[in-house]
Amino acid sequence: MPNPSQQKLPDLASTRKLQGLLAVGHLANDWSPAAIWLLAPAIGLAFDLQPSQIGLLITLHSFGAALAYLPAGILSDRMQRPGKLLLFTFWWVGLGYFLASFAQNFWVLATVLAMAGMGDAAWHPIATGALARRFPTRKGLALGIHAVGGTLAEVFSPLVVGILLSVMEWRSALQLSILPPLIMGVVFYKFRNAIPISTTSSISKVDLVRLLRSWTTPKGLALITAITTYNMALIALMTISPLFVQRELGYSTSEAGLFFALAMLIGATGQPLVGRWSDRIGRRRVFICGLAIAGACALLATGFPQQGWTAGVLIAAMAILVFVRSSVLAMAVDFSRQREATTLGFIFALMDGVGALGGVTAGLVGNFEL
């Protein structure tokens, strides 16, 4: 007699309900990590940190996440039912960031935030791997819809935190930010066995060697360079822009939150459209076009830093880089053509590991300019 969870599976996996469930889960899981973008300047004030130390805090936060991506992807490809792993990530995130709110110095806080970020990181290759398997011909669109959830977290979480920081200190604001993942951790329990199973055999050492060889070819190395450079630029902008608009343009914390939220909201709405566009005309064309336009916007902002439209240009630069994120992930899966979760785990590790150096680099520049 079939398992009840198996009877539910086709109905969930064959409709948009799967995309909706994973997008909402993505939003909840990313809520606490996204709060750090606006909490970081407040933490800097509380701990009397330099801009470079604020950048280092965000870099270590991202680096901790990078350590979890690849193991999570490999584990997902070894397990037929990834839903239980996804359920576990909500509780890891909630409890991890709650503990971080009690840190009394920079290094304890950085360490606990890095460990908490691992829980959120584990969600990404597992969920996106399931979507890439379920929608093989529409990866750009499917990953774009999933990405909307995470980007909406980066819209509303900093916005809410910016408001909270005007009435409370950063520890209380961080503690309130754990509510979405904990609530979703309860809701998701019902769906833990309804995530599409993997029909391929468990990943082996031979598979890993084959995957590694494909990424060490000249084409693979060029793609790695492009992806890490892209994420360094995005993280650098996301790190320094809230600090810049507060120190140079005189924004309050709530105004900085609104500025950041607007950039992420514009980026979120564009991801499914740009992902679908890349399904039709090709990933590379979309990627190159997006980077060129975003780079031009960033140069305009640095060339005229005191102009009234500077914030608008920075919003455009961040939004455009967010636009192409789903296309970047789909481009990586198209290249490897195997083991979607492991491939995406590898790419996420590159983006948040090597790419996170953009945060500390931006902070070092801020030491001299802000």
Give residue spans per PLM region.
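Cytoplasmic helix-loop-helix junction between adjacent transmembrane helices
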Residues: 112-150
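A late C-terminal transmembrane helix in Major Facilitator Superfamily
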Residues: 338-368
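C-terminal transmembrane helical hairpin of 12-TM major facilitator-type secondary transporters
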Residues: 281-331
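Conserved MFS/SLC helix-loop-helix module at the cytosolic interface between two early adjacent transmembrane helices
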Residues: 67-104, 278-284
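Juxtamembrane intracellular "pre-TM" segments in multi-pass secondary transporters
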Residues: 2-13, 195-224
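Central cavity-lining transmembrane alpha-helices of secondary-active solute carriers
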Residues: 59-74, 261-273
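C-terminal membrane-cytosol helix-exit motif in multi-pass small-molecule transporters
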Residues: 178-200
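Extracytoplasmic gate region of multi-pass secondary transporters
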Residues: 36-37, 219-268
